[in-house]
C-alpha cells in the first residue's frame, strides 16, 4: 500500500461565508461543490444537516480538498488547538506568491500571526542542503485554526 496524496481536511465552521472568503479568496482554493447534506450522528440520534463546501487544490485523480462543514441542526462547538499543542495544530499550503496572499489576508481583515520573513533552507523537507529556500507565513482562519502558507524562492 502506498499513499498517493492527501484526500481532504475537514474544518468545522460557524460562519461559512467568512471561512469561504478565507480559503477561496486568500488561500486560492477552487470551490467544486457547495451543498446541504444529511448525515448520521450515531445509532441513537436523528440524522442532522450540514452545509459542506468542497475546495480543491491540485489537478487530476488525486487532487486534495479542504471541506468546510457547517452544522445546520445545532450550534457548532469547540475551539482551535493552540499552535504546537497535541493534535493537528496547523496545516500548510504551497502558494505561488506569498506577498500577494498576505496582502489579500490583511485587506480582508484576517489575522497574520507570522508574516513571510526571511527564507530558510529546505532541509526540513528532506532535501539536500542548498535546496531552494522557502518563505513561510502563518495565518489564522476565521475559526482560529493556524494555516501556514509556503513559497519557494
For each predicted feature, which ranges?
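Active-site beta-strand termini and strand-to-loop segments that position acidic
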Residues: 55-60, 137-142, 152
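Conserved catalytic-core motifs of GNAT/GCN5-like acyltransferases
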Residues: 10, 30-41, 114-120, 126, ...
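Structural preference for beta-strand elements that scaffold enzyme active sites
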Residues: 8, 65-67
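Core segments of cupin and vicinal oxygen chelate
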Residues: 11-63, 100, 107
Amino acid at each position: 500500500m502506498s499513499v498517493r496524496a492527501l484526500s481532504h481536511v475537514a474544518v468545522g465552521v460557524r460562519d461559512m461565508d467568512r471561512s469561504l472568503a478565507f480559503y477561496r479568496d486568500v488561500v486560492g482554493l477552487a470551490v467544486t461543490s457547495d451543498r446541504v447534506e444529511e448525515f448520521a450522528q450515531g445509532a441513537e440520534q436523528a440524522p442532522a444537516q450540514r452545509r459542506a463546501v468542497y475546495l480543491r487544490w491540485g489537478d487530476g485523480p488525486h487532487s486534495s480538498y479542504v471541506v468546510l462543514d457547517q452544522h445546520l441542526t445545532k450550534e457548532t462547538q469547540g475551539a482551535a488547538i493552540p499552535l504546537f499543542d497535541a493534535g493537528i495544530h496547523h496545516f500548510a499550503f504551497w502558494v505561488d506568491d506569498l506577498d500577494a496572499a498576505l496582502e489579500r489576508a490583511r485587506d480582508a481583515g484576517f489575522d497574520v500571526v507570522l508574516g513571510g520573513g526571511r527564507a530558510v533552507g529546505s532541509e526540513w523537507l528532506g532535501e539536500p542542503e542548498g535546496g531552494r529556500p522557502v518563505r513561510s507565513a502563518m495565518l489564522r482562519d476565521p475559526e482560529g485554526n493556524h494555516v501556514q502558507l509556503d513559497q519557494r524562492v
